[in-house]
A protein has these predicted regions:
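AlphaC helix of the protein kinase catalytic domain
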Residues: 1-11
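A conserved short helix/loop substructure at the end of the activation segment
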Residues: 152-159
Length: 159
């Protein structure tokens, strides 16, 4: 998907919806089997010839023993990492994949991740402050913006 984004630069809302829906279904499948991917990003989403997404690179994935289990491993890709992983206080669970899905959604619409910065520490600070905006020069519907805002909530229980 990252190669396709480089060619396209941004996706239409219809295409973004098409791909995001597939990511959500794949994440639902994983979570139903108590698997957290923990590194969802465009570079780990692969398209087949029918434009069907397959999730790859399960190197950071973990299988929980029970649904309420929480993990404390710090892992993921800086632009996509959830704030609760950075904070590390109460651990993390399925909600980190939801956060990353929101970052993917934004990235498809805008062409770059919402918290992208000049260096990793600045990116982490922006994530923890939930500091991002939609470019004013882009026409993005209020529905798409609202969905993104609902997913990219710092408090994981609000996602």
């Amino acid at each position: 998907m990252s190669k396709l984004l480089k060619c396209e630069q941004t996706f239409s809302e219809a295409d973004t919806r098409f791909y995001t829906q597939q990511v959500v279904e794949a994440v639902r499948y994983l979570h139903g089997r108590l698997i957290i991917h923990r590194d969802l990003k465009l570079g780990n989403l692969f398209l087949n010839s029918n434009k069907v997404i397959k999730i790859g690179d399960f190197g950071f994935a973990t299988k929980l023993a029970y649904p309420d289990e929480r993990r404390k491993t710090i892992c993921g890709t800086p632009n996509y990492i959830a704030p609760e992983i950075l904070e590390g206080k109460n651990g993390h669970s399925f909600e980190v994949d939801i956060w990353s899905t929101g970052v993917i959604l934004y990235t498809l619409l805008v062409g770059k991740p919402p918290f992208q910065s000049k260096d990793v520490m600045s990116t982490y600070k922006l994530i923890l402050m939930n500091s991002y905006d939609f470019p004013t020069e882009m026409t993005i519907s209020s529905d798409a913006k609202n969905l993104t805002h609902k997913i990219l909530q710092v408090l994981y229980n609000k996602r």
